[in-house]
């Protein structure tokens, strides 16, 4: 068992370095491609692959490289990844968008780690960032998630939550993902 933070992945017996020491910014850029609904899945994979690895052109097995990248992003072993893929509930409500919500996540993670993760030149490994993110307690970010969760489940908001929602609706509402085809239909004279 390796107890260290991963800085490389092994693909077909050869080690390949993750760009910038697997800094959270590299991973969030990859996640951003997956959140971009204007890209098809193959393009999302390709863009993330090119971003994640320090020397992606030296990798000959792109499918395995993408799988290994997703293992690192999801912070899982291969067995956990396979089990999660088989059990994943596609109907679970989406509660966050890393790109939209980063301005709320970064201060909360920084509070846990004791330094500002946005400091230029300071590397924070993705797993360190993710571990701190999982430890976030009461803060504005957790309030946003709580409100989104209640709304997604059709639960009634408390009065103080309704007040926050009215005041910060733009921050709390997630972008609606519609396809180009749906946009075209909405803009037509139907």
Residues covered by each model-derived region:
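Short, charge-rich amphipathic segments
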Residues: 1, 59-60, 157
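A broadly used, surface-exposed interaction patch
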Residues: 37-39, 46-51, 56-90
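Generic structural hydrophobic/aromatic packing signal, biased to beta-strands
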Residues: 9, 16-18, 48, 69-72, ...
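Generic structural signal for short, solvent-exposed loop/turn connectors between secondary structure elements
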Residues: 19, 37-40, 61, 175-180
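C-terminal charged interaction modules
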Residues: 70-190
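Short N-terminal mixed-charge amphipathic segments
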Residues: 1-56
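Short runs of predominantly hydrophobic/aromatic residues within well-ordered alpha helices
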Residues: 20-27, 44-45, 62, 66, ...
């Amino acid at each position: 068992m390796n107890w260290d933070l991963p800085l490389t992945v092994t693909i077909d017996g050869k080690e390949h370095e993750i760009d910038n020491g697997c800094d959270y910014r590299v991973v969030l850029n990859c996640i951003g491609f997956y959140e971009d609904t204007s890209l098809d899945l193959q393009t999302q994979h390709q863009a993330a692959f090119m971003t994640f690895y320090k020397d992606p052109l030296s990798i000959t097995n792109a499918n395995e490289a993408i799988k290994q990248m997703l293992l690192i992003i999801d912070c899982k072993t291969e067995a956990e990844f396979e089990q999660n893929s088989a059990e994943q509930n596609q109907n679970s409500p989406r509660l966050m968008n890393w790109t939209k919500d980063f301005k709320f996540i970064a201060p909360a993670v920084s509070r846990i780690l004791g330094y500002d993760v946005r400091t230029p030149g300071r590397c924070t490994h993705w797993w360190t960032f993710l571990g701190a993110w999982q430890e976030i307690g009461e803060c504005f970010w957790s309030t946003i998630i709580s409100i989104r969760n209640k709304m997604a489940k059709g639960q009634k908001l408390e009065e103080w939550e309704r007040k926050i929602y009215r005041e910060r609706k733009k921050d709390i509402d997630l972008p609606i993902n519609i396809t180009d085809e749906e946009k075209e239909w909405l803009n037509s004279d139907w």
